[in-house]
């Protein structure tokens, strides 16, 4: 996987993933911008874009999936929420005080965080007050990731999570 750091400010994006830029393995599918950002923000953006790349690769390798339907044409809320959750989960392993990206648009949700964290941890739920009090907890990142296969909308992903995994809080997943 090639990453390309662009030494310029970009007010609309800290980075992006485009699978088509990997044509013949020559290009960089991931571009990162805004070198003036803090190291934890650059790290988090890198993780976010790598999560997109891993999601796309998982779909390409899985028999019966459709890379256009299940990734390129998929609902932004699902694709971005997955990457946002991976970003939060992995960045906190290196930067323990990392609280996640600001909630900029409705497509970048904290649903993955809510699926993973416990109600005890919820008070610091990504440092945000709007999502406190959810009753869902205990799903693993592996479960959430594997539930993405064959999904192109949040509703399908949510239903896959509930159908595939036994969890004492799954009756509350619809509230997220």
Model region roles, listed by residue range:
Residues 100-176:
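Pan-zinc metallopeptidase signature
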Residues 50, 54, 86, 90, ...:
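Generic structural signal for hydrophobic core residues of well-folded globular domains
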Residues 30-46, 71-74:
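Short pre-active-site segment immediately N-terminal to the catalytic Zn-binding motif
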Residues 44-61, 80-84, 88:
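Active-site recognition of the HExxH zinc-binding catalytic motif
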Residues 66-113:
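Post-HExxH zinc-binding segment in Zn-dependent metallohydrolases
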Residues 11-17, 63-72, 99, 121-136:
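Surface-exposed intrinsically disordered loops and tails
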Residues 1-37:
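Auxiliary, metal-adjacent structural segments of Zn-dependent hydrolase domains
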Residues 8-13, 36-40, 52-53, 59-62, ...:
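Solvent-exposed loop/turn segments at secondary-structure junctions
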């Amino acid at each position: 996987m090639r990453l390309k750091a662009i030494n310029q400010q970009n007010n609309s994006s800290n980075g992006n993933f485009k699978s088509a830029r990997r044509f013949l393995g020559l290009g960089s599918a991931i571009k990162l911008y805004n070198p003036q950002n803090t190291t934890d923000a650059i790290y988090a953006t890198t993780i976010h874009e790598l999560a997109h790349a891993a999601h796309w690769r998982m779909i390409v390798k899985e028999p019966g999936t459709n890379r256009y339907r299940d990734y390129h044409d998929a609902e932004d809320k699902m694709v971005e929420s997955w990457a946002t959750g991976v970003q939060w989960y992995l960045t906190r392993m290196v930067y323990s005080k990392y609280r996640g990206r600001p909630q900029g648009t409705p497509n970048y949700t904290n649903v993955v965080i809510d699926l993973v964290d416990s109600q005890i941890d919820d008070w610091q739920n990504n440092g945000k007050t709007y999502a406190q009090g959810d009753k869902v907890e205990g799903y693993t990142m592996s479960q959430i990731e594997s539930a993405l296969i064959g999904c192109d909308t949040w509703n399908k992903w949510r239903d896959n999570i509930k159908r595939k995994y036994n969890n004492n809080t799954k009756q509350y997943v619809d509230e997220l």
